[in-house]
Amino acid sequence: MSENIIPVRAVPAHDHEHDGERACMSRRRFLLFGGTSVALLSIASLPGVAQVMQALKADYARQRIGSLSALKTGEPLDFNYPYPDVRNILVKLGVAAGGGIGADKDIVAFNQQCTHMGGPLDGTYKAEHQILGPCPLHLTTFDLTRHGMVASGHATESLPQIVLEVQGDDIYAIGVLGLVYGFDSMNDVQPA
């Protein structure tokens, strides 16, 4: 048995007699990589390099889409806005949400087309989790409590959120926050 054992020997980093058996990283290489890493990370602190991106909002004609008294928690209401063929969902979530309106900030509206490849999200609202999806194409789901951000799946963009306002008991859509799938810019086409 002892014939098959290969002795292991320690090789100091400065021992040049054994080429190819150096330590995995020399002091010089460590300092070079460390300095490069610090330099690259500090670039983000330069003025104008790292900027906060603001969500783009397209303003449209104000349109009544529902009433506070008619909404029931967890029961979505479908509507079209800003064009007749753009399908959306209005829902009272029962929990506060980003961009929510009403006394509890729990009423939100979102477009019903997946931002990945435009799959239809009609009828996929899950009230117990406040999510929309999964998309029938690639199973993306969206969290409606967090501005429609992707909860899972292939999409990389949040769902376009319909900007709402309340006047008395009436709920109005006044704009779109984000880009609806299939449009290169929501302001390119005039509402019908």
UniProtKB/Swiss-Prot annotation:
Q: Give the GO molecular function terms.
A: 2 iron, 2 sulfur cluster binding; metal ion binding; oxidoreductase activity
Q: What is its EC number?
A: 1.-.-.-
UniProt cross-references to InterPro entries, sorted A to Z? AioB/IdrB_ssu, Rieske_2Fe-2S, Rieske_2Fe-2S_sf, TAT_signal
Q: Which SUPFAM superfamilies match?
A: ISP domain
Record keywords, A-Z: 2Fe-2S, Iron, Iron-sulfur, Metal-binding, Oxidoreductase, Periplasm, Signal
Residues binding [2Fe-2S] cluster: C114, H116, C135, H138
State whether keyword Ligase applies.
no
Q: How is the cofactor bound?
A: Binds 1 [2Fe-2S] cluster per subunit.
Give a Gene Ontology cellular component term annotated to this protein.
Answer: periplasmic space
Q: How is it modified after translation?
A: Predicted to be exported by the Tat system. The position of the signal peptide cleavage has not been experimentally proven.
Region forming the signal peptide = 1-52
- Could you tell me where this protein is found in the cell? Periplasm
Cofactor names from the entry are: [2Fe-2S] cluster
State the family it belongs to: Belongs to the AOX family.
Q: What does the UniProt record say this protein does? A: Involved in iodate respiration. Probably catalyzes the reduction of iodate (IO(3)(-)) to hypoiodous acid (HIO) and H(2)O(2), using a reduced cytochrome c as the electron donor.
Assembly, in brief, is: The iodate reductase (Idr) complex is composed of a molybdopterin-dependent iodate reductase (IdrA and IdrB subunits) and two associated peroxidases (IdrP1 and IdrP2).
NCBIfam families linked: arsenite_ox_S
Protein name according to UniProt: Iodate reductase subunit IdrB
The organism is Pseudomonas sp. (strain SCT)
Q: Specify the taxonomic lineage.
A: Bacteria, Pseudomonadati, Pseudomonadota, Gammaproteobacteria, Pseudomonadales
